[in-house]
Amino acid sequence: MAGQFKSAFAVSVSIIAMGVALPAHAQDSGAGAEPAADTGGINEIIVTSQRREENLQDVPISVSAFTADQVLARGITDVGRLEGIVPGFTFGRSGQDARPSIRGVRTENVGVNGDTTIGFFIDGVYQSRATQATAGFVDVERVEVQRGPQGTLYGRNTFGGNIAITTAQPVLGEILGGLDVTVGEYGRFRTDAFVNLPVSDTLAVRVAGSLEKSDGWVKNVNPLGNNLFDDDSKYLRATVLWEPNDQFSAAIKFDYSTRGGAGGSAFGYKIIGSYFDVGSRQQLYNGTPVLNLNTRGGNRDGVNDALPGGPATSDLGVPVFAPGDGYTIDTDQKTILDLENKAITANLAYDFGGITLRSITGYTDFGAIRTQDSDFSGNQIAIDYQDTRAETFSQEIQLLSSDTASRLDWVVGAYYFHDELTGVFINQQLPRIIRNVTPNLNLAQNGGGFYDEQRATTESVAFYGQATYEVVDNLRVTAGIRWTEDTKDFAFANANAVLPTSGTPAVPQGTAITLNTGPIPDSAFGAQGAATNCTYTTFPPPRPGFQCLAANTAVLTGATYDTAKFRKATWRLAVDYDVTPDNLLYASVSTGFRSGGFNSGQGPAALQPTFDPEEVTAYEIGSKNRFFDNTVQLNLAAFYNRYNGLQEQRQVPQGGTTLSIIENSGRARAYGGEAELLWRPVTGLEIGANVAYLNAKYTEYDQVPAPFGTSILVTDATQTTPTIVNGVQIAAAGQRRVFAPGYDCGLIPGTGGTGQPAAAFGCDISGNSIPHSPDWTGAVFAGYDIDLGSLGTLTPFAIMTFSSSFFGQPFNSVLEQQPSFQKVDLRLTWAPTDYISVQGFVNNVTDERTINRFVWGGGGALQASFAPPRQWGALLSIRF
């Protein structure tokens, strides 16, 4: 490891030194500097990465930033569109949940008992749910992506970095407005609008809104189902700015949004395979072992009988999964998305003269209902229902220096965060298995169902400070520290359906069933006592695709309650030096953490331990440069990160089965480099490129079982002869060998037979690549404003993004691998005046079909979510 560390940094230092050695023509890059318009110079971008407004090129942190004009011109409509444009940033998605990845850090657990690893902030307010990060951008002023832990100034759950959105603020004394209308493939129609109105010399209001409709780009060939990734969203925001004098300002923002339609399923939306030959693996039908007969879903009910719409004697051989590509499914259930978000934000500031007091207050009321066809087939077998409710309040107070003549810049602050979260998950299975079941799905003859309810409360308090001192001219030293205490309460209860057992089956085949009972009593949540947020009266609330069966009853089968405190100090040390006014060198070491939490599930308390925070120590060196009269910008960074206490899922044996829990069971390291180049040689011409190299590996990750306890034990320690597979001896007599999904776990000690679960033994996968961490990513882009004289300007713009191959899960099997790919976006914009433009665009011109999320489902079926296919459209923009 030490050798890799030294080699990586040696290469990076050489690159950075070469960059600084290029001839530089000094130009003031401080606030207020004007671009060199006669040579097509590069405009400066103001960012708030250090909680104060600064020129991007003066900030000793790896950060990419985009202005409102760049967001519009490059089609950055949401966080997912940043992939490739931001070096080293990859974007995964399951349904409506964002799963971004930066420098080997990814968001995996998005449940009630989990926190994100990449922070998401809107106007300085932390957004606690991963779903909130997938909303479209509306009237934004700036988008920033900070790479590396931001544990000092931003705090908890900025383990891998930050995504910070700044919305457009009201402007005093001006009437402004805009309208954007987008039409496109899949019936897309979107309207964005804003208006800025001055009420008086000291008061202004800005209102922005958006409406979007589309038909969905994942086609369902089943007439009973619906297309996925359609859109039915509405957004409204109103911001009031009051500046009665030069010292005080107050910006109060109200926003409301909804998203409806079918959504994108809850986890993955398509099964792409299984990690073993399902034709040779036993499954259980009503407790009786039977064999799978078809790798694409054959007869799994073990009964030769006539089924409605099926063959007279057998249901073998009818395909389950829709033929074709990743954008075609065959599911019978109409999935649902019903999301609502209400928020109030207040940003207040008062300048005392050399010191500024700032207050940032945020309140969010979030709710999301989602369903999915959990058998992923065209048969009425199983459906999932999720209902998540979150109410969040945060208050931050900052005191920061504002004396530009001083050698010392400092900021101190206090932060309070309170989050109340309730999650309901319901699974229902229809009576009796019918043909073409999902691979390896165990079902009972009379169907079944279960209901899980989780309640989590998080209260976080933090105090922080950071100071930068200019020791001598152009040389600055920065030190910062943050202390955080998280108090978490967690309650879990589970109820299983108890169905009548008479008859074969007891209820008519094809009847949808679910739990039909009152809420789980508050007493089930132990020490939590009486609660007021358990308001459901039926499970689930009436929705299409769900029917209630009056004969059902429910029995409480498990309950857990726990509380814990997690305390952590994070810090940052840095030094930066201006070689010239346009060339900055910096080096830093910083730490970050992701908060700990609780496990949930059935079983004794001993198997439901809390898990501690994940921790990271990050080393970084970098350089930010402007050359050739402000026409070339080159930013470089190299990093080495150590991750400890990784929160990873593990299966443990319990009562003849296995339980899935989260433990701090791993370590990892990531090193690499990033480069961003922008060249504007003449007015109107822009050429750019970025590239990132990443080597992210697990250094300690043992006893990891196959997903959901379904490791394949292919040898029997009780047999007296060697085990031969395809003519090759894989185990001697008396040995057993375990295979996980596409991964040979090797020989495992013990005496069990073939039927014994291997989850108690697991695999050592140290040295495997961290999921969603391609070695190489980057982009090349170019645009040119062609002067048409009285007809305005015509601007072609093209960008090609690329990624090397990567794995989607820790086992690194070939089934989980996304091959390398390139994607091309094209845009052509005609602007007859400064106030009107028309843009035609094609995203993903070559229709590359890439997977951005892999997840192992029950029974070893691999589910996947694909990135959007090729899409074309047109955009009309009007400004006044």
Spans of model-derived segments:
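C-terminal beta-signal and adjacent terminal beta-strands/loops
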Residues: I799-F811, L815, T829-F880
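N-terminal Sec signal peptide and the immediately downstream disordered periplasmic leader
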Residues: A2-R74, G80-I85, D246-Q247, I344, ...
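Periplasmic-side early beta-strands and strand-to-turn transitions of outer-membrane beta-barrels
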Residues: A164, G173-E174, D180-T182, P198-L293, ...
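Solvent-exposed loop segments that connect transmembrane elements
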Residues: V218-F229, G264-D330, S374-A382, V424-E453, ...
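Membrane-embedded beta-barrel scaffold of Gram-negative outer-membrane proteins
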Residues: N347, D351-F352, R358-G362, G367-Q372, ...
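Acidic, small-polar-rich N-terminal luminal/periplasmic segments of exported/outer-membrane proteins
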Residues: G40-L172, I621
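Gram-negative outer-membrane beta-barrel transporters
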Residues: G30-G32, V477, Y640-R642, E663-P810
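Outer-membrane beta-barrel translocator/receptor signature
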Residues: D115-T117, R129, V138-E141, R147, ...
